[in-house]
Each structure stands twice: as structure tokens, then as C-alpha cells.
UniProtKB/Swiss-Prot annotation:
GO-annotated biological processes: phototransduction; regulation of DNA-templated transcription
PTM description: The 4-hydroxycinnamic acid (p-coumaric acid) chromophore is covalently bound via a thioester linkage.
GO molecular function, one term: photoreceptor activity
Domain PAS: start-end pairs: 23-86
Gene3D superfamilies referenced in this protein's UniProt entry, alphabetically: PAS domain (3.30.450.20)
Protein name, UniProt field: Photoactive yellow protein
Keyword Ion transport set for record: no
Keywords associated with the record: Chromophore, Photoreceptor protein, Receptor, Sensory transduction
Length: 125
């Protein structure tokens, strides 16, 4: 497996052909969403950060059902703006606190190379 670095400019190239098993071996959280925010993939590292089983979140709306603490201009607003412009590519710090101890993270959002989907990468700080 290739090493994938959090925050790298070409991270979406590395993920384009990754299997679910490879995705689960990443050292940071990786969540793939469609344009509406529906969860398509949710890796094991993200489960470790949030305590949520990937099987329980696949198909749910990330902003409404999985992480309502992200339903803010700072998080969901950036996602929607990037989706609307077709060029989602942003990085910022955030605090996840929905049904968990407040956890400061770095978030990296990128448009996927394949399909009409988007990645949210999460690393604890």
C-alpha cells in the first residue's frame, strides 16, 4: 500500500483506486459524501475518532444524522460552497462534539477525482 499523507495536494489521486480495505488502513479519518451530504464511505480511523460504526452511518446524511455539530457555516457552509463551485478544496480546524468528548481536529475537504463525490479527511490534533 502507498503511504497517503493527510493534507497533501493530490490526496484524491491516491484514493481514487483504493479498496475499502486500503481506506481502512489510513492513519486519518476519511469520509466520502455525495453532493447532498449522504455518507458513501466511512473508514476505520474515523470510527476511532467518533466511536461510530461505519455500517451505522453509510447512507445517512452526514450533516443531519451523523455529525450535526458540523451543521454550521464554518463546516457545512464550506462544503456546500465547494460543491456549488465544483472545486471543493479547503483545510481548517474544527471541534467535533456530537455525542462524544469535544475533540479538536484538522479537516481537509476535497472533490473526488472519480464519480460526483467529495472527501472529508479528519485528523486529531
Amino acid at each position: 500500500m502507498n503511504i497517503v499523507h493527510f493534507g497533501s495536494d493530490d490526496i484524491e489521486n491516491s484514493l481514487a483506486n483504493m479498496s475499502d480495505q486500503d481506506l481502512n488502513q489510513l492513519a486519518f479519518g476519511a469520509i466520502q459524501l455525495d453532493a447532498s451530504g449522504k455518507v458513501l464511505q466511512y473508514n476505520a480511523a474515523e470510527e476511532g475518532i467518533t466511536g461510530r460504526d461505519p455500517k451505522s452511518v453509510i447512507g445517512k446524511n452526514f450533516f443531519e444524522d451523523v455529525a450535526p455539530c458540523t451543521k454550521s457555516q464554518e463546516f457545512q457552509g464550506r462544503f456546500k460552497e465547494g460543491v456549488a463551485n465544483g472545486n471543493l478544496a479547503t483545510m481548517f480546524e474544527y471541534v467535533f462534539d456530537y455525542q462524544m468528548k469535544p475533540t479538536k481536529v484538522k479537516v481537509h475537504m476535497k472533490k473526488a477525482l472519480v464519480d460526483d463525490s467529495y472527501w472529508i479527511f479528519v485528523k486529531r490534533l
